[in-house]
Amino acid sequence: MKQKYLFIASMALAGCGSMSESNKYWIQYKDIDQSVKEVSFWSREQFHSPSDVKGTVYQRDNLTHLATSTPLGEIYHIYDVNHIPMNVIFLDTKTQRSLNPQNAQDMAQLSKATQFDFYEFGKGRIAHAVFSAKTGLCQDFKSKRGVALKMATNYYTDASYKGYYVSVIHAIIRHNGQHTDFAYTPAFSIADTKALAMTQALEKQDGERVAQMNLKEKVTLLTNIVCQ
């Protein structure tokens, strides 16, 4: 299957680098329900094609021990418009099975599901989105009903991934790019006062615009990958 491409919305924060070397570390993020969680990345030593599993993400509640962590899902790659690979998880909410975005059968299965979780790691951010439909994802996406989207995107302010700004959005999205019931809420977890002030100023200037771009990004995720 050909590579799948996705437009990326990003904030111009300081630490927008790769998370490829974070295997041994736990990174904190705030989820859609505002609970604080931590994730760690364990890469596969060998994979033979671009469509192979690249690794596994483990998750735990904030400040608990490794023994209580559980596998969140398997990492696959999709590609942005610059052909840069993105670390993602497509998780069927009902079965809790990780699905391969490069596998036509997996995407056909997902297209008929009523809900799935999407995670993205890298480019200085961690995002978790939940897509929900009443009858089927792609059927509703291409109809007036649309698909309910709720998402939290954590943008990290430096390479240590200690401070972050969170963009929480809710909306109904549709195949034609139109959306309704849009709501955007910012949150901050930044100890350094100067970094907090800078990030709050940036959010005030660009936060809602980037949130709208995130909606367009998730529309392309369904259009180009799940419902093509």
UniProtKB/Swiss-Prot annotation:
- Top-level taxon in the UniProt lineage: Bacteria
Q: Name one GO cellular component term.
A: plasma membrane
Q: Please, where does N-palmitoyl cysteine lipid attachment map on the chain?
A: 16
Intracellular or extracellular location(s): Cell membrane
Keyword Membrane appears in the UniProt entry:
yes
Residue span of the signal peptide, if any? 1-15
**Keywords noted in UniProt:** Cell membrane, Lipoprotein, Membrane, Palmitate, Signal
Q: Where does the record place the S-diacylglycerol cysteine lipid attachment?
A: 16
Q: How is this protein positioned relative to the membrane?
A: Lipid-anchor
The similarity comment for this entry is:
To P.multocida PM0015.
List the protein's name: Uncharacterized lipoprotein PM1509
- Recorded source organism is Pasteurella multocida (strain Pm70)
